[in-house]
Amino acid sequence: MKDFMYLEDLPNFKKSVSEAIALKNNSLKFNSLGQNKALGMLFFNPSLRTRLSTQKAAQNLGLKTMVMNFNDEGWKLEFGNGIEMNGTSSEHVKEAAAVISQYCDMIAIRAFASLNDKKTDESELVLNNFARYSSVPIINMESATAHPLQALADAITIKEHKTSDRPKIVLTWAPHPKPLPHAVANSFIKMVKKINA
């Protein structure tokens, strides 16, 4: 597996859940696995739990983390091809991904849907451009359409706490006055199908 951008990137999801539970129960078992390796964490949107849990997991594996908050630090990136860069973008993703790949052994990205243009959001512009132009694996920390790390964590919780082989699982989506991203719900539904719950 080169990238972990979607649940489908895991060849055996149930096995991955079992391995994750075993690792959770012995979180420092592989504490030297990432020695002399770096995880670049790129945030185009804020994060609390995903950011902390990913940094802690990296630390437990012996990885160093390098964090960039792209809306507050660094240059605004351009994602379109053939565009004259004389506006607010000072760096093209093609060059940025190549540079970050030189310093990091993996790149984790969090880039929400804009909720302005569904077609553009569904194209996963940020995630797919980094996957295209980087030379290292990409990890999705939540994108416009998917949040595989959250779905993996949800699968762990279900497996650890279920009292029957097929527990009743309900996903509730409440009305909200403003548009909300659907990445978590999308990945949750796919995960439930994969664990046959």
Model-identified regions with their sequence ranges:
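Positively charged, low-complexity intrinsically disordered leader regions
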Residues: M1-L52, K56
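Residue-level detector of alpha-helix boundaries and kinks
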Residues: K2-M5, M85, I139, P177
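Alpha-helical scaffold segments in soluble metabolic enzymes
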Residues: K15, E19, V99, N129, ...
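Secondary-structure boundary motif
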Residues: K29, R132, E160-S164
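Phosphate/diphosphate ligand-binding glycine-rich loop within oxidoreductases
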Residues: G34-G40, L48-K159
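Glycine-rich phosphate/diphosphate-binding loop of Rossmann-like nucleotide-binding domains
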Residues: F44-M66, K159-A197
